[in-house]
């Protein structure tokens, strides 16, 4: 199997894309650490993975809290050993509670909460995971970004800015740690049938079709596997061609 011997920590894996990635990674032989806000959903996902013969555990990591991230990463390593794959997939909690607003209607707190949940969370997860990857001789970090970082989506200012920051963070991580065997890449996700995407306005026109979580899972699998060992600092756009139909957006 493609991920035998690997340990993957996937944030935001209680539903949608994250849950699907966790199932796909486990099916390819990885030990998977799921994390998210819902303990009940997380534990049910672990049961499903174990029922299919995979190995998994759940940790309720708050990716916006440095203490929670530090303790969660330590707990994952205590259970499974060094993390070889980090998937920064968690979406900002505040995005669920904030209606789509133009910039002048946002409070500073709303802005800060969404940006913190987008890019600061990826920084914190990387900060506490990378040292163990370096000790183990390398690893792969995959940042799950959004087409909102590329296009100016009305009402999604802080989310677009946060995900744009994540794209830049990918390049910094690749530059900082590439010579030490740690790779970092971004998947820019278009419209996918999931909880988060279903809340947004219909602003895209895909050449192919609306995506599903497995479309993103396949890209993440490749970036986590050794077959992509020469790829770092790159962006993979998985949006059904919507980027090239921008005149219709």
What are these regions, as identified by a protein language model?
Residues 146:
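Residue(s) in the substrate-gating loop at a strand-loop-helix junction
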